[in-house]
From Swiss-Prot:
Keyword NADP: yes
KW Cytoplasm (keyword) present: yes
Lineage, uppermost ranks: Archaea, Thermoproteota, Thermoprotei, Sulfolobales, Sulfolobaceae
Broadest EC class assigned to this enzyme: isomerase
Organism: Saccharolobus solfataricus (strain ATCC 35092 / DSM 1617 / JCM 11322 / P2)
Name the record gives this protein: Isopentenyl-diphosphate delta-isomerase
GO molecular function: FMN binding; isopentenyl-diphosphate delta-isomerase activity; magnesium ion binding; NADPH binding; oxidoreductase activity
Primary localization: cytoplasm
Family: Belongs to the IPP isomerase type 2 family.
Annotated Pfam families: FMN_dh
Described purpose of this protein according to its UniProt entry: Involved in the biosynthesis of isoprenoids. Catalyzes the 1,3-allylic rearrangement of the homoallylic substrate isopentenyl (IPP) to its allylic isomer, dimethylallyl diphosphate (DMAPP).
């Protein structure tokens, strides 16, 4: 088995310090226009950003999506993120816990999260390829109990696995059968998330047919995991690097993924993530059809700079979210979901070509 601990460290190093954010790709969020209301009818002080994340109330419709863990230095990053997430009352996901299940010495970098964040929703994380390799209920329960998780994310990353030097692109259909059986035995919900390439309506419908109702888009336009693996290939002289260059713009852009999932599964719980870099981006994702917005890379970069930097980052994000709510006349998150939007450009073309009637979608996104 390759040294997945060192691989995780390298992933974080490349993500934080190399040019992989939005490389050769777009979220299409620029094609979403929130309609300005010159007389909002509310005051800034009465705006309520609280919402629900499954059984728990959170202070804002924003979450930290899973990133890292597995070694002491990664545990320190997780600790900072968890402490700040607890202070701001927002959910936090951890990176893949495969390393902690297979290497006991890696567990502390994950368990620290619940120790310093006793009340917020924490989301465990395992990969779909591990289901093919034989993971079952025992491993899922271990991942959940390890951090006293409120939910568990199962990540899809076929594009990353294809170009990874030591990748395991194993996605046979029986993995979904196993996931369906496991979900019936768990006490917490499963969220299926992508890893930077988005969820299409075909994938959403397939997952839904196996009992999955919770999704995280992780669309194209944010952290480019094909680029990360390309850099790792280059460092090793691996011939896959040249091929990876041709796929840097592969995937479903975040805004398109939000529309596709919401349109095909109207009752889904949906995290809109992938290139969310501001409170305005978060508001657009929610108005477009997500329940909450998720972000990872900007949180990681701020956490590396320190706790104060991350606190300032979240203050900025939440202020921008509230500013958008003010300027759209949205007193609360439910009102933001129903706010007026205009869909332009490539996103409109994408939706229409994919057979999505935007007049019908207008009612779907507003949950009417």
């Amino acid at each position: 088995m390759p040294d997945i601990v060192n691989r995780k460290v390298e992933h974080v190093e490349i993500a934080a310090f190399e040019n992989v954010d939005g490389l050769s790709s777009s979220t299409f969020l620029n094609d979403v226009i929130l309609v300005h209301q010159g007389f909002p009818g509310i005051s800034f002080s009465e705006i309520n950003t609280k919402t629900k994340f499954f059984r728990k109330e959170i202070s804002a419709p924003i979450m930290v999506t899973g990133m890292t863990g597995g070694r002491n230095e990664l545990g320190r990053i997780n600790r900072i993120i968890a402490e700040v997430a607890e202070k701001f009352g927002i959910p936090m996901g951890v990176g893949s816990q495969r390393v902690a299940i297979e290497k006991a010495e890696a567990r502390e970098s994950f368990t620290i999260v619940r120790k310093v964040a006793p009340t917020i929703p924490i989301i465990a994380n395992l990969g779909m390829p591990q289901l093919v390799k034989g993971y079952g209920l025992k491993e899922f329960q271990d991942a959940i109990q390890m951090i006293e998780a409120d939910a568990i994310a199962v990540h899809l990353n076929p594009a990353q696995e294809v170009f990874q030097p030591e990748g395991e692109p194993e996605y046979q259909i029986y993995a979904l059968e196993r996931l369906r059986d496991i979900s019936k035995e768990l006490s917490v919900p499963i969220i299926v998330k992508e890893s930077g390439n988005g969820i299409s309506m075909e994938t959403a419908k397939l997952l839904y047919s196996y009992g999955i109702k919770n999704f995280d888009t992780s669309g194209q336009g944010g952290t480019n995991w094909i680029a990360i693996e390309m850099i790792r290939d280059i460092r090793r002289g691996n011939w896959k690097a040249e091929s990876a260059k041709n796929f840097l713009d592969w995937g479903v852009p975040t805004a398109a993924s939000i529309i596709e999932v919401r349109y095909s599964i109207p009752d889904a719980f949906l995290v809109g993530s992938g290139g969310i870099r501001s409170g305005l981006d978060a508001a657009k994702a929610i108005a477009l059809g997500a329940d909450i917005a998720g972000m990872a890379l900007p949180v990681l970069k701020s956490a590396i700079e320190g706790k104060e930097s991350l606190e300032q980052f979240f203050r900025k994000i939440i202020f921008e979210l509230k500013a958008t709510m003010m300027l759209t006349g949205s007193k609360n998150v439910e009102a933001l979901k129903r706010s007026s939007i205009v869909i332009l450009g490539k996103l409109k073309e994408w939706a229409e070509y994919r057979g999505i009637n935007l007049s019908i979608y207008e009612k779907v996104r507003k949950r009417e």
